[in-house]
């Protein structure tokens, strides 16, 4: 099922990009 695979790929990307953006915003705020 390509749709299911792309869905899990999207969740994996979101779960890795979101914390990275959050940490980046915190670093910018600290500077």
Curated annotation (Swiss-Prot):
Gene (name only): petL
GO molecular function list: electron transporter, transferring electrons within cytochrome b6/f complex of photosystem II activity
Keyword terms: Chloroplast, Electron transport, Membrane, Photosynthesis, Plastid, Thylakoid, Transmembrane, Transmembrane helix, Transport
Function: Component of the cytochrome b6-f complex, which mediates electron transfer between photosystem II (PSII) and photosystem I (PSI), cyclic electron flow around PSI, and state transitions. PetL is important for photoautotrophic growth as well as for electron transfer efficiency and stability of the cytochrome b6-f complex.
Family the UniProt entry places it in: Belongs to the PetL family.
Pfam families: PetL (PF05115)
Compartment annotation: Plastid, Chloroplast thylakoid membrane
Entry's Gene Ontology cellular component terms: chloroplast thylakoid membrane; cytochrome b6f complex
Top-level taxon of the source organism: Eukaryota
InterPro entries, sorted: Cyt_b6/f_cplx_su6
Protein's recorded name: Cytochrome b6-f complex subunit 6
PANTHER family: CYTOCHROME B6-F COMPLEX SUBUNIT 6
Leader sequence residues: none
Transmembrane stretches, start-end: 4-26
GO biological process, one term: photosynthesis
Assembly mode: The 4 large subunits of the cytochrome b6-f complex are cytochrome b6, subunit IV (17 kDa polypeptide, PetD), cytochrome f and the Rieske protein, while the 4 small subunits are PetG, PetL, PetM and PetN. The complex functions as a dimer.
Primary location group: plastid
Membrane protein topology class: Single-pass membrane protein
């Amino acid at each position: 099922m390509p749709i299911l695979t792309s869905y899990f790929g999207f969740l994996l990307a979101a779960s890795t990009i979101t914390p990275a953006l959050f940490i980046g915003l915190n670093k910018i705020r600290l500077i």
